[in-house]
Amino acid sequence: MTPPIADRLYQQLEQILASRIDPQRIITQEAKRLAYGTDASFYRLIPKIVLRLKSLDEVIFAIQSCGQLGIHFTFRAAGTSLSGQAVSDSVLITLTDDWRGHEVQNQGLKIRLQPGVIGADANKYLAPFQRKIGPDPASINTCKIGGIAANNASGMCCGTAQNSYRTVDGMQIVFADGYVLDTRDPESVARFKQERADLVEGIHALCQETLANSELTERIRHKYRLKNTTGYALNALVDFSDPIEVLTHLMIGSEGTLGFIADITYHTVIEHAHKASALLVFADIEQASQAVTTLSKTPVAAVEMMDGRALRSVADKKGMPEFIAKLDLEAAALLVESHASDAQTLHTQCEQVMSALQRYQIIESVPFTSESKTVATLWGIRKGMFPAVGAVREVGTTVIIEDVAFPVENLAAGVRDLQALFDKYHYSEAIIFGHALEGNLHFVFTQGFDKQSEIERYGAFMDDVAELVAVKYQGSLKAEHGTGRNMAPYVELEWGKEGYALMQKIKALFDPKRLLNPGVIINEDKHSHISNLKPMPAADNLVDRCIECGFCEPVCPSRTLTLSPRQRIVLYRELQRRRTTGENVASSELEQVFEYQGLDTCAATGLCAERCPVGINTGDLVKKLRTAKYQKFTPIARWTAEHFSATTTLARTGLKANQLATKVLGEKSVGTMMNGLRRISKGKTPLWMPEMPQANTHSLELAVENLPRSDKKVVYLPSCASRNMGQQASATDQRPLTEVTLSLLNKAGFEVILPTELSSHCCGMPYDSKGMTEIAQSKAQQLENALWQASQGGHYPILMDTSPCAKRSIEQFTKPMEILEPTGLVSRYLLDHLTLAPKQETIMLHVTCSSRRLGLENDMLKLAKACASEVIVPEHIQCCGWAGDKGFTTPELNAAAVHSLKEQVPAHCSRGFSNSRTCEIGLSHHSGIPYQSILYLVDEVARPRLATQESTEQPSEYA
């Protein structure tokens, strides 16, 4: 047990840290400590201080400051680890977005990465070289390099040959006393050997001690035939003799208990361009396991095993093969994938695989295919299993995913014994799947911790699992998820007294004060795995399925400003728990924090739902909670909805007044006056910015009347924003979007139909975002009826010129109508009738969150590339955070969401494009260049395709 630390020491530490670190990044507020302290594991420790550090100097300073006061600390990257290795009741050190540096080296053969780089981003940087990093954890779209290396994470294809231990080239390390070593720098190494001879000699002594014990040496070599992340990487002591190499490899998988990895260089691996997958079903686990042994000798990259219960858990999911629902629980499936550099080689490999399996009876199958939709469905089966259990669990329980490895020759027996333990301890919902080539199995089950009897059941179950895996089959209790707190009590059981003693010596050598992440890997408390368990109280059925995995966080626009979706749910659960126990939270710090950080700064655009493994849209909860907050404004809102034409006329008048004032007084004077008023009103008036749109004075109805008639027709619904907002004064093309849209439709030869009473229509989003569901639904219904009539019962396509309106209408409408935003309409209907002459120009492209949710990201990029020679989609900006009117009312959300935009705009780039008029205001403001609808770009490069061309030319891919 770690001894308690006096509060005065934390107060002293806070004062010391504040002398060199921005106090806003030193978090001591209770609610934020709770939110920031949560990770994906089922353990709950609340840190006393959370640090968000932006530089190596700050990390060194924090480590040394903690060391001076004897205060322990823990490092956290993305917080997706599952074994409790990234929670702390002391000081939690996290990193800002400043730690995303990367350098591709040797034409992609190596890559240098800072710990804040997301794994998938590293692969994106390597993609042009047909390379990738070796580790491929399931959380790769969220987890960061720091965690990947510190946990020695692997994955489906990685195995033991391509994990961090095998592919690390070198790293920069900060030790427990703040000393820095760069193992890639000869001068740094020479200095280290001289100044830290104690560490060098200590490592050498450990190697000698290990090699002198032939039995232990053989045990180490034997155990690392399998995936193994239980304890420290003892194989480093037998694989290497150079102390620097030993040290480097000991850091891999050390879970922040030996030092901080400040950056790392990996040897990369080939990313094959050609892949094929097959689903093969066998009558039972024995036959499937025998097939795995056969497959290990064939050219396969991945073999995923799924037991009968696992298959049953996803049988009713959309797109699943029909035969899955008919399989009995004895069945077992293998999802097999093969990779090759060319199509012919891949075809030959697939034939070799199936030929090798001829002696087995395959009762059902989806044959090898490279067709993207089918492949996605097949891997959707495997990836959907963990969330499938999570989605149906009882409220108040958590989902636990354990991670073991059996010798492959004992795979079937191990599965049978695990299934017997499920029955013994009444885990009827438990499923098994995993990376069969490595004997690495995951089993998933639900567990409540609200009763002592449930905690004891879990404890007894884990005792039996440990005995089964580590003793009976001599396997690994943690194959790839890391030891953490979860398996720390069993490390000695798996490794024996000598192996465990060696690990204790490693810890003492690197961290003599035991300040680095105490309780992780080395823990004398035999009950640590059933202590400090995270409560999962019922909060709201919209979010009760949340497993707090954190997959949502990278796409959230408020994650660096206030809270992420995971953190919002954590705080709301705590609020509800306190309410349930009768505590008055009405004026508590937690309630006040949640009001602004949880509700006001949530964009509620739902990108989190796209990343959530169980499909939770935290924005839906936020909008529901906003209902009470905005209830007093409901009468005003209802009046505006019923008099929408008058409301928009007032808005347009306001834009005209701003336009006139700016012309007469100048931008600087108007800005000073309006933003001064905002300060006086404490943010109750909207932010003014130079990019404010002018009023749209285009007479749309009259213009439509003057267009020629055609047998090609489209219904056009300009959004409220498009109808009323013109362009900013600095935009090159000053035409309103409505005029540009008509120009493009006319070039393509389409007749335009407007719905009746156009100025009174709205999709309802402004009301929905405030939680005024009834009013929002009423407006949506009114619009649906008008569009149904205008499209002659859905006969003609309908264009909504901003993507948020299109997305909401698609979701809300019940009548069969084809609703399209600009990219969809141009791609599907207009391009066949246009010829594009692309500009030799670099442009910026922002893909809105609604476009992403509609699955249009690739289509939008493809269209932009057909219109301009270079298209830049800025990194790390998923949602701009404008969120309807929040860019005016909560501008800090927009600023945080696009804070990295301006630095990504090249000097020779003068404009950007998107497909949401309001989003374009904030993008223009923060980028320094005007953003307009992508329809402006298409109209600029498009010309009508002649009738003779249409009849003789095949429609090209955006030619």
Stretches found by the model and what they are:
Residues 522, 559-594, 615-640, 932-939:
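Non-heme iron-sulfur electron-transfer modules
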Residues 17, 41-73, 91, 95-137, ...:
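N-terminal glycine-rich flavin-associated loop
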Residues 42, 82, 87, 126-170, ...:
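A gly/ser-rich beta-alpha-beta helix-loop segment of oxidoreductase catalytic cores
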Residues 388, 489-538:
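Activity-critical C-terminal alpha-helical subdomain
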Residues 518-520, 551-575, 601-628, 808, ...:
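Iron-sulfur cluster-binding cysteine motifs and their immediate structural context
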Residues 511, 619-959:
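Iron-sulfur cluster-binding electron-transfer modules in prokaryotic oxidoreductases
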Residues 528-548, 582-604:
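Ferredoxin-like iron-sulfur electron-transfer modules
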Residues 1-64, 78-109, 257-275, 310-329, ...:
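N-terminal flexible segment immediately upstream of the FAD-binding catalytic core
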